[in-house]
Design a protein with these regions (language model features):
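Cleavable N-terminal signal peptides of Sec/SRP-targeted secreted and luminal proteins
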Residues: 2-18
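Carbohydrate-active catalytic/glycan-binding domains of CAZyme proteins
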Residues: 20-398
Length: 398
């Protein structure tokens, strides 16, 4: 009995010591270390002993962009005419009560299983708040365009739309699936003065040169402009954690950082894709990613651990990758229900505009269990600050 008591005390001490912080890195740079108490004080939107997990609030069913089960049309070859796969929310600069979502759909009802070559970019709108529901507004690209990321460049006074893919004018007679070996993803950018277009022709900025060690896919852009430094420089993060910068959105993109860890796929616990990169209010850098850990450890299972968080004081590193979950595929809803999705990928955040860079919403492409083509875009609020944001816009309960 005495031995058991001593062991319990030691385990408690060791656990408490393990949770202590010494530097802000111990708080994932998502908060500050209160050294007097050796505990982390997390920024809004983040929770956990090390502030490494998103504080996700319940989502509302049938918000986001969720039209995957609408009936197919006469020109569709399959049954998923409005399946979508993730996207990014942009608040209208002229009418703050209007929100835009840039996402992808799949032509001819081919759904997610036919993403290459059937994926194309659309713009959807919500007039009922940032959570949606969003409704189709217009088509932005031809096939094949996928994985869009859109940012506003204050220096250029333009919207910059990055995506992967190539324009393809083939007349389809059936749903197809084309491998990477035939169609490299590549990364291109288009620009517009207005979020409703017109959009300039896509210009390729990075090609998928695997022999050179670059897999150009999954773009995530961040303009470096600030009021103190009104630069036109752009940061572009891509899969396998390669980070590029360009002096302007039209300039040459030069490699500034490559992951120091093993980025090979399949058996690697650090395997990620779909980075979403940003700079916080302290000037530190972060990304959330689709983490493939269960695929590696559980015989290609795609759930429930799906999100990772990486951070660094400088863009050029060192970047810290804690092998722990930042979010899962288990989603709780406002009706009291919950659901574990088979896939939850393409994470992107919508931040507060007050300079605090508080994450208010996360978007993902999600797919239910036992599905292959049906998918939709989920919007989930984060923390509690989103309530004030919506209230100031006149949305939500009084």
């Amino acid at each position: 009995m005495r031995y058991l008591l001593i062991l319990t005390v030691w385990v408690t001490i060791l656990f408490a010591f393990a949770q202590c912080c010494i530097t802000d890195e111990d708080c994932s740079l998502n908060g500050i270390c209160i050294k007097r108490h050796q505990t982390c004080q997390c920024d809004a939107g983040w929770i956990g002993n090390d502030c490494g997990r998103l504080d996700l609030a319940p989502a509302t069913r049938y918000t986001g962009y969720n039209h995957t089960y609408e009936p197919p049309g006469p020109n569709d070859f399959n049954i998923w005419p409005n399946a979508s796969w993730g996207g990014r929310i942009i608040q209208d600069r002229n009418d703050k009560r209007v929100f835009h979502l840039f996402t992808v759909q799949f032509s001819h009802g081919c759904g997610l299983k036919g993403w290459r070559p059937h994926s194309y970019i659309i713009r959807a709108e919500s007039h009922t708040g940032p959570q949606g529901p969003y409704h189709y507004a217009d088509t932005v690209s031809k096939n094949f365009a996928h994985n869009p990321d859109i940012v506003y460049s204050p220096a250029d006074k333009k919207y910059l739309l990055y995506s992967i893919g190539v324009e393809y004018d083939k007349l389809f007679t059936k749903c197809e699936s084309i491998s990477y070996t035939r169609w490299p993803n590549n990364i291109s950018v288009s620009a517009a003065d207005d979020i409703r277009g017109p959009w300039s022709p896509f210009k390729m900025v990075l090609d998928s040169d695997r022999p050179a060690g670059i897999h150009a896919t999954n773009p995530s852009a961040f303009p470096l402009w600030t009021r103190r430094n009104p630069t036109r420089e752009i940061v572009l993060g891509i899969k396998d954690y390669s980070i590029f910068t360009a002096k302007t959105w039209k300039s040459k993109y030069e490699l500034k950082y490559q992951a120091t860890w093993n980025v090979t796929e399949q058996q690697n616990p650090e395997w990620t894709e779909d980075p979403f990169i940003w700079r916080d209010k302290r000037g530190h850098w972060h990304s959330i990613n689709h983490w493939m850990i269960d695929y590696v450890e559980n015989d290609k299972q795609q759930w429930p651990r799906v999100g990772s968080h990486l951070f660094s004081r400088k863009l050029t590193g060192p970047w810290h990758f804690k092998l722990q979950e930042a979010f899962s595929s288990n989603v709780t809803f406002t009706d009291g229900s919950w659901q574990v999705f088979k896939r939850r990928e393409r994470p992107k955040l919508f931040f507060s505009g007050d300079g605090e860079m508080t994450p208010l919403y996360m978007t993902n492409g999600v797919q239910e269990m036992n599905q292959t083509g049906a998918s939709f875009t989920l919007v989930q609020p984060i923390g509690t600050k989103w309530k004030d944001f919506e209230k100031t816009l006149g949305f939500g309960a009084p």
